[in-house]
C-alpha cells in the first residue's frame, strides 16, 4: 500500500512532505514522488501528518483495570519485598478498556509490569495495543526486571521487613549476590536446588535484562547507580524526579532516564521537585530520555499531551516527540522494530490532522503491523 503527500515525521530525519509504502506488516520504502505498483492501493494524505506509533516505556496498562477495586488490580504482590519471579504478563488484561483508549490515543507499543511496592517486583514485558490475547500481543517477554527504591517499599513494609533505605539496598544486594553464587554453582556442575526467584534474576546478572529502577529522589537515583556499578548490571532510571540536581552524575553513569509522571498533584515528599522541565534539561545534557505516563497514574492516551507539556516547559519540540517514539524504543531495545518510520521496521504509525503535540490534533487512523487498528 502506498501513502502519499503526508507531512512525515520518520524520527530518522527532518520532517518532510512525501510518501511511504508498507507491505506484509513492515515499512518498505520512504521518500518523495513514489509510484504505485500495478494494482497497489494508494491513499492520498494531503494536508495530514504521519508519526510512528507512540511508545510507552513504563506503565501498568491492563494491570490496574478501570472502574474496579482489588478484583482488577494486579500491580503489586505485597506479600514479600523480593518477588522477581512475578511475571507482568500474568497480571495483564488486554481487554480492559484502558488498552483500547491507549490505542485510540496513538500508543501502539507499551512496556508494562509490576508496580513499586517491592524491592524486586517481577518482570516487565512489551506488547502491542491491539488484540484480545496478551500472548499474541506480546513482542518481548521479559523486557526488564522491576526494582524500587525510596518511599514505596518503605511504606508498604514499614514495621515488618523494611524501615530504612539501607534495608532496601541490603535486600537487593543480597539477592544479586545470591544469584551470582547460584550461577557459579550451576555452571560448575554442582547440585543446586531449583530457586524460582534466583532463576528470574539470572538474566539481570548476565546483563541480558536491565533492572527497571523506580527512583524519585536524588539520593535514591545515586544509590541505583552505585549498586549497578558494584554488580556490573544494566539499569534504567525510572521517574527520575530529582534528576535535574544530579545531571552530571547521571550523564557520567551512561544510564537512560524515563521521566514522569509529571502531571497531577505532588502527592508525597518524593514528588516535590516534579516538573515537566526535567526531560528537557536531561535531553540538553545529552542523556537519553523518554517521557512516561506511568498509566494509570496518567491515562495512557495522554502520552502525547505529556510530551507537549515538556515542550511548553522548554524541551525542543522535535526532541519531545522523540521522547515518546524512538527514545523509549531505544531504552527498551526495541528500536530495531518500533519507534520510527524506516524500511524494515514494523508498520506502526498514526495519521493526524495536526502535529501530535497540538492539543487540537485529531488522530484519524492508527495502524499496527500494517493493519488499520483505529
Go through each PLM region and give its residues.
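Histidine-rich, glycine-flanked metal-binding segment
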Residues: 8-53
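Divalent metal-dependent hydrolysis catalytic cores, especially in the metallo-beta-lactamase
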Residues: 81-87, 95-130, 138-152, 208-211, ...
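His/Asp/Glu-enriched, well-ordered alpha-helical/loop segment
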Residues: 66-67, 73-77, 83, 210, ...
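Active-site core of metal-dependent hydrolases
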Residues: 88, 183-275, 290, 330-332, ...
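Active-site gating loops and adjacent loop-to-helix segments of metal-dependent hydrolytic enzymes
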Residues: 65-92, 133, 147-153, 203-205, ...
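Metal-associated gating/positioning segment near the N- to mid-region
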Residues: 48-114
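Metal-coordinating catalytic core of metallo-dependent amide/deamination hydrolases
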Residues: 126-226, 230, 268, 296
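C-terminal cap of metal-dependent C-N hydrolases
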Residues: 6-10, 18, 330, 342-374
Amino acid at each position: 500500500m502506498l501513502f502519499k503527500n503526508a507531512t512525515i515525521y520518520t524520527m530518522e530525519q527532518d520532517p518532510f512532505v512525501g510518501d511511504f509504502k508498507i507491505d506484509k506488516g513492515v515499512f518498505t520504502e520512504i521518500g518523495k514522488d513514489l509510484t504505485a505498483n500495478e494494482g497497489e492501493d494508494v491513499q492520498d494524505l494531503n494536508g495530514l501528518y504521519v508519526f510512528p506509533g507512540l511508545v510507552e516505556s513504563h506503565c501498568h496498562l491492563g494491570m490496574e483495570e478501570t472502574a474496579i477495586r482489588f478484583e482488577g488490580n494486579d500491580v503489586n504482590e505485597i506479600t514479600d519485598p523480593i518477588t522477581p519471579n512475578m511475571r507482568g504478563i500474568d497480571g495483564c488484561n488486554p481487554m480492559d478498556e484502558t488498552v483500547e483508549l491507549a490505542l485510540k490515543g496513538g500508543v501502539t507499543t507499551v512496556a508494562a509490569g509490576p508496580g513499586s511496592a517491592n524491592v524486586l517486583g517481577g518482570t516487565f514485558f512489551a506488547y502491542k495495543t491491539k488484540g484480545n490475547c496478551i500472548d499474541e500481543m506480546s513482542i518481548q517477554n521479559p523486557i526488564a526486571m522491576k526494582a524500587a527504591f525510596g518511599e514505596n517499599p518503605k511504606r508498604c513494609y514499614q514495621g515488618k521487613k523494611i524501615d530504612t533505605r539501607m534495608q532496601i539496598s541490603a535486600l537487593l544486594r543480597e539477592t544479586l549476590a545470591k544469584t551470582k553464587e547460584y550461577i557459579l554453582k550451576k555452571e560448575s556442575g554442582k547440585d543446586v536446588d531449583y530457586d524460582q526467584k534466583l532463576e528470574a534474576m539470572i538474566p539481570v546478572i548476565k546483563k541480558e535484562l536491565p533492572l527497571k529502577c523506580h527512583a524519585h529522589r536524588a539520593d535514591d537515583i545515586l544509590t541505583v547507580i552505585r549498586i549497578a556499578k558494584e554488580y556490573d548490571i544494566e539499569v534504567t532510571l525510572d521517574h527520575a524526579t530529582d534528576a535535574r540536581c544530579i545531571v552530571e552524575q547521571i550523564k557520567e553513569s551512561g544510564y537512560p532516564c524515563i521521566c514522569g509522571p509529571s502531571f497531577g498533584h505532588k502527592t508525597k515528599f518524593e514528588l516535590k521537585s516534579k516538573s515537566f522541565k526535567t526531560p528537557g534539561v536531561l535531553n540538553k545534557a545529552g542523556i537519553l530520555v523518554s517521557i512516561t505516563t506511568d498509566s494509570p497514574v496518567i491515562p495512557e492516551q495522554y502520552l502525547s499531551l505529556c510530551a507537549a507539556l515538556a515542550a511548553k516547559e522548554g524541551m525542543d519540540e522535535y526532541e519531545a516527540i522523540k521522547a515518546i517514539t524512538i527514545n523509549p524504543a531505544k531504552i527498551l531495545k526495541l528500536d530495531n522494530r518500533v519507534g520510527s518510520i524506516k524500511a524494515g521496521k514494523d508498520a506502526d504509525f498514526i495519521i493526524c490532522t495536526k502535529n501530535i503535540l497540538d492539543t487540537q490534533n485529531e488522530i484519524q487512523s492508527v495502524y499496527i503491523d500494517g493493519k488499520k487498528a483505529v
